[in-house]
Each structure stands twice: as structure tokens, then as C-alpha cells.
Amino acid sequence: MEKKLVIIDGSSLLYRAFYALPPTMTSPDGIPTNAVYGFLRMLLGLYRDLDPEYMAVPYDKDRHTFRTEMYEGYKATRKPAPDELVPQFDLIRDVMQVMGVAVDCLGGDEGDDIVGTLSLRYENEMPVNIVTGDRDALQLSSSRTTVFLTQKGITNMAAMTPEAVFEKYHIEPRQVIDMKALM
């Protein structure tokens, strides 16, 4: 049986879990845990459904990236992470490490850049599944890479193969960049 790699856009899914579940979930010492709980529910469902041999969870470390070096206005209007979410990034990183899941949050790179790099690096060696809420990732869909787009809540996802991308948007995955530039 061929080995599989699942790459989870950690920032995308942690934000989705944070907003999908009530902020009343906390640890005994008062640290919010709603995003961690929702993220782990998604992760365990992915393990069950996709049965990967390898899993990686890249996420954004900070707002300072090579893109902000090139253009100060890059994502300048984006609000910072809510205070209740910030400590959950470290919690989820710790849980992933205990579970043996590769966690990558390199400074200077965005999580979705790492998702793309890993996908292109490994798709010739094994099937790759990307899990994200970021439609920009559709450009990575190929005969060896399926992009699972999160939909409503924390458990519904759409498997976006090249055929599914074409059926929904009437473009090839390689044209996603052009479509986004025109929007």
C-alpha cells in the first residue's frame, strides 16, 4: 500500500475551530481551549478517514515575513489574533509534538507557503492531502494532491481534485492564481 502525507494548514484550521466552538471551554487554570479541542476533533477525524503514514501541521509564527519586507502594506489591515486564541497556538504545537506530528512555524514564512512547499516536494513520492480553508491552495490540486477545503463547522470538507476545481470554477488548478489576481 502506498504511503500518504496529510498536510494541515494549522493556522487556518485553528482559527476555524476557535470561531466554531464557544469560548467558555478552558483548562482548569483558565487558559482557553476551544480551538485546541476543535482542532483535535478535526485531526482525529482526518486520521480515521485518510489513514496517513505522515502528517505535518505548518502554521504562521508571526506577522513578519519576507512579503512584509517587500511590501509594508502586505496584510497590514488584518486584525491580530484574538487574545483568547494566542495561547492556544503553543498548546496545539505541544500536543502535536507529543502525538509525533511534524509542526513547522518558521519565522519569515507563512504557513500556507510551507504547505505548498511540502506538497510540491512530496507529491512525486506519495499521494498528498492538504486540509485548509484557504482557497488559494486549490492551485496545488493535481493528480497526486487533493485539497480538502473546510466548509461549515469543523467536520465538513470538500475534496477538491483537479476535476472538482474545474467543475466548480471552470478553470484548471494552475489558473487559480490568475483568477485570484483578477478578483
Label every model-predicted segment.
Residues M1-D60, F66-R67:
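Non-catalytic, usually N-terminal nucleic-acid engagement modules in DNA/RNA processing proteins
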